[in-house]
Amino acid sequence: MTITLFFDTETTGLPIWSSPSGDPAQPHMTQFAGMMFRDDHLLASMNFMSRPDGWEIPAELTELTGITMEDANKFGLPEETVYRMALKMIRDADTIVAHNIPFDARIMRIAAKRFGTEDEAEEIKAKRRECTMTLGARELKARGMTGTGKSLGEVHKAIVGCEISGAHNALVDVVACRQIWLKIKENA
C-alpha cells in the first residue's frame, strides 16, 4: 500500500533557477499545504502560513494568493517550523505529487538550505515524484485537446470537468491536484 503526499507551496516569488538553492535571494515559502493518503484513506493533512521574519510578501503575491503580511504575522508559524512539518510529511510518503513539482520541490530544497542540511535537500530532490502538470499535458494531448496543460485551472477544468474556486491557495490547489491525479489514474 503506497503512501502518497499531495502538496503545494505559495511563495514570495519564483525561484531564481540560475542560482543555487542556498542563495539568500531565493524566495520564501508563505504557505504549505499537504494531504497524505494511503489509497483513499487520509492519513494526515496540514495547511500553514509562514510568519515573515525579515522578509516581505510582495503586493502582487498578496493579490494572487490572498496571503497578507497582517494575516501571515497573526496566523503564521515560523517558516522553519512549517518546513520541518512539511519535511516530515515528505519523508513519510512513498511518492510526492504536485502540480509543477519542479517548482514546489525546489521551494522545499530552498527551505532545506535555510533551515536544514544538505542531506535534507538531497533527500527532497531524490524522493519519488509525479507531476500533474506533466501528466495533465499528456492527457490533454491524448484527448486531442488544445492548451498547454501548464495551468492547474486549465488542467482541472479539462480533466475533472469543473473550475477551481480559490486557486493559488495552497490547500485549494492540493485538493485540485489530487482530483486531477485520481482522474488520470482512473483513465489509465
Residue ranges with predicted function:
Residues 9-22:
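Short acidic, Gly/Ser-rich segments with clustered Asp/Glu that frequently serve as metal-coordination loops
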Residues 2-4, 25-69, 87-188:
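Metal-dependent phosphoesterase core characteristic of DEDDh/y 3'-5' exonuclease domains
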